[in-house]
Design a protein with these regions (language model features):
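A common structural junction motif
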Residues: 70-74
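Short S/T/G/P-rich N-terminal loop/turn motif that feeds into the first structured element of a domain
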Residues: 1-48, 57-65, 81-106
Length: 106
């Protein structure tokens, strides 16, 4: 499994951002090997962390080739003040007690 951590400082979102963001999310969900995502908002700032879960690197790379995703990456300065992407291969994931809707999609 692979995780993509997308850390961002939001800027100004307009209607075009929301339309493109929805299209990118739909493309992710339609990509074979997409396992889900989790979103956290930092209480002391406007910073957001979104973690995407992928079954394999091939699945992630397939999504990375999506035209809407590429367009969003090129236009990040229009909507974000800052961003950081970290891609990690998961060696092991375990835990208990958060419930089915928040446990890592294994």
């Amino acid at each position: 499994m692979y995780l993509v951590a997308f850390r961002l400082a939001p800027g100004e979102y307009d209607a075009e951002f929301h339309e493109l963001n929805d299209a990118i999310q739909a493309a992710a969900e339609q990509t074979e090997g997409y396992l889900g995502k989790r979103t956290w908002h930092a209480p002391e700032s406007e910073e957001v962390l979104v973690v995407y879960y992928w079954e394999s690197l091939d699945a992630l790379e397939s999504f990375g080739a999506d035209p809407d995703h590429k367009r969003g990456k090129r236009r990040w300065t229009e909507w974000y003040d800052a961003y950081e992407v970290t891609i990690t291969e998961v060696v092991e994931a375990y835990g208990s007690g958060f419930g089915d809707d928040t446990d890592p999609p294994l």
